[in-house]
Amino acid sequence: MLTDELKSEIQVAYSQLLEAKGYVARHCQKQMIADVANTLGRIEVDEDGTRTSSHPVCVIEAGTGTGKTVAYAMAVLPIARAMGKSVVISTATIALQEQIVFVDLPDIREHSGVDFSYTLAKGRRRYLCLSRLDSLLQDVQSPNQSLAFYDDEMYQSDESYQALYELMLTKLGRGDWDGDRDNWSDEIANDAWFPVSTDHVQCTGRQCSHYENCYFYKAREQIHRVDCIVTNHDLVMSDLMMGGGAVLPEPEDTIYIFDEGHHLPDKAINHFASFLQIRSTQGWLEQIPGILHQLNEEFGNMGSLNIASFDDSVVNLMQRLEEVIILFEPLREFAEGNDTDMRYRFPGGQLELGHRDLARVLFQETGRLQGQLAILEDRLEEELEDESQKDSLEQWLPVVAGMNARAEACMNLWREMMLEDNVSEPPRARWVNFREGDELALHASPIAVHDSLQELLWSRCFGAIVTSATLAVGQDFSRFQRRTGIDAGNHFRALQSPFRYQDNAVLRVPHMSVDPRTADDHND
């Protein structure tokens, strides 16, 4: 409930900020503050503070010059504190993220009288992995290197980076660096950084011997101690797809602010899309038998590991993938693009029966392999309890976990390829890319994510604000509602820009002899 006390706090803070900065109040900014505050103030909760009412979302189109950051911060921060909720400000671009963290929030905290803490949340890949650094410094040919299997994760052991890794260790020891890639004194090349970072799949978490000193987990602890977290749409979507609360606070205890909110549907589509490169997949499948033989030799207690069963699964999958190439290759004739990347789109997103049947077989065969890898991953996690083998197992578990995740990703693609779309729902886009050489990449993607966003985000969050300069067509938000799944019963408003462009500028559209959609002709 928006009490008189909260209203007064917001008004006083806003007035103090304007006075301190020498700003003049803008009608559109004041309207935005009121809309956000009223939307959040209408949220009903039970005795545990859990939202019980519907329509907790406020969607505001506000043009350049409105002062959107000040508007939503002035309204949300006092209300969130009063309700005991966290605030997550999410942007689509690094530029706006840095503007908010390094300029806007410090200004607001200093001049408004609102006392709050904030931090910047980043993904795991932005932080150094101590386990991997330790491995690299001890032995350049550690399992994590020699057994990499993703194409974009393959790299050669390069002793020229050893000096960099030793300098990293020295700076960490002196407290001159916090393990954040962005805070290193120079730009770090990707092929130097990748070997000393990890992802959520290959991270062993609390079981890692370096857990207490892990820079990612230290940063995550900070996330749960502050009032306001600034991050990006991708990290929010990743957190939601992991169930919520994996990196960021639980959605039920969070008021989300999506700045540059027009990007949100496309970001969500990217997270729900699947793809698979045939030759690349064959490459990592071929490595599995050798990896497992090496694992079995290193750990005597893995004697019960059924290597033959893994070998059979790999052989079957390799054969099926060759069938994929034979079956899909004739489509190259109808593909569009350049010589190095041709694309064939399946009409209406629908595959022919033969393509779907093969995808169904591959889904089943990949599922068999994934099940075997999942059992092995669980086995290794159990063995981690044995301190005598902990160091070696910490090197092997990420490798097996990564293979398991890769198999799951392949299953997702084959599942999308084998299914027929429900005629009452938007179809999925499905296409194949013919790349240089004989590489063939299959893709499947939703064209609409409104139901997924409703399920993962809008139905769970305590409250949300979505804002951007481009959300509506005139005063009509219906297209944005369809794309995001935000129910029309929520609050929507398109604010007038404080800039009178119509009185100060003229838009001239030149006569052109070519269609702007034809890029080559248009550029000539």
Please describe what each predicted stretch is.
Residues 194-229, 238-247, 376-513, 517-524:
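A contiguous, basic/glycine-rich beta-loop/short-helix subdomain that forms a polymer-engagement track
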Residues 86-95, 113-130, 252-263, 276-288, ...:
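Conserved beta-strand -> loop -> alpha-helix junction used to position metal-binding or nucleic-acid-contacting
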Residues 37-41, 69-83, 103-107:
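Walker A/P-loop NTP-binding motif
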Residues 45-75:
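Walker A/P-loop
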Residues 2-15, 24-27, 48-54, 64, ...:
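A substrate-engagement module of RecA-like helicase motors
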Residues 57, 86, 228, 255-256, ...:
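Hydrophobic "anchor" residues on beta-strands that sit immediately upstream
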Residues 23-48:
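N-terminal pre-P-loop "Q-motif" helix
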Residues 78, 95-98, 103-106, 200-228, ...:
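Signature of the SF2 helicase/ATPase Hel1-core->accessory helical subdomain module
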